[in-house]
Design a protein with these regions (language model features):
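Catalytic cores of NTP-dependent nucleotidyl/adenyl transfer enzymes across multiple folds
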Residues: 11, 17-18, 32, 37-41, ...
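Residue-level detector of functional hotspots within protein domains
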Residues: 2, 20, 39-41, 45, ...
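Hydrophobic transmembrane alpha-helix bundles
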Residues: 66-68, 72-73, 83-99, 161-180
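Active-site nucleotide-donor binding segment shared across nucleotidyl transfer reactions
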Residues: 44-75, 79-87
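N-terminal regions immediately upstream of nucleotidyltransferase
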Residues: 1-38, 66, 85-97
Length: 207
């Protein structure tokens, strides 16, 4: 995927347009799916980020399991609570104590996301994308990618929605691909990649 990400803009555009024609969708959809997948690959190829984060949510059901047909614009991630607290949020305590701990963990998570996490993600993604914390939501990092196909309904950004209080278990390793690689596998030196993901049954249960 890295090779495709670094193709000349014209070559990338042709790949996405041809893939879209085969699929009966718009090039902007194929383009955004590529960048969602590329961001996922970069995050979980980095040892530090892979230790901090876990893939979850509806996007995981479509991208990692193929259980729902859904075009995914956002990436839901669980932040390992141990990065922001020494106290186990699952330990027995009073409701008042639990509420205080949850608030403390959330506050530390906001600090961590804007500091260490963003500071790690930026060099991992490199100069191809611009990464910023969402102005109106401190749990979101927006990754702006080099869009070639303007679309009134698709922002040229991948939203990383990050929370520390979601369940971490059960999880497993799954392989993920993108639309363009499925249509033109010969263009990709690596058609798919591995991510650590909350298992589908847990995600369905939470929904």
């Amino acid at each position: 995927m890295e090779r495709v990400a670094r193709l000349a803009a014209r070559e990338r555009s042709e790949l996405f347009a041809e893939s879209a024609a085969r699929m009966g969708t718009t090039p902007a959809v194929v383009e955004k799916d590529f960048w969602v997948s590329w961001v996922l690959r970069c995050l979980f190829a980095d040892a530090q980020l892979a230790n901090w984060l876990m893939f979850k949510g509806g996007t995981s059901l479509s991208k990692a399991y193929g259980l729902i047909q859904r075009f995914s614009e956002d990436i839901d991630l669980v932040l390992d609570w141990r990065t922001v607290s020494n106290a186990d949020p699952l330990a027995k305590r009073s409701q008042t104590q639990q509420n205080k701990l949850n608030a403390d963990i959330e506050a530390e998570a906001v600090r961590f996301i804007a500091g260490e996490l963003l500071g790690r993600i930026r060099p991992v993604l490199g100069e191809l994308c611009v990464c910023e914390v969402e102005v109106n939501d401190a749990h979101v990092i927006n990754v702006r990618y080099p869009a070639a196909f303007p679309d009134a309904y698709l922002r040229p950004e991948v939203r990383l929605e990050i929370g520390p209080l979601a369940a971490w278990l059960p999880h497993e390793l799954r392989r993920v691909s993108c639309y363009a690689a499925e249509q033109f596998p010969a263009v990709f030196t690596q058609r798919d990649f591995e991510v650590r993901v909350i298992r589908a049954e847990r995600t369905f249960w939470e929904k």
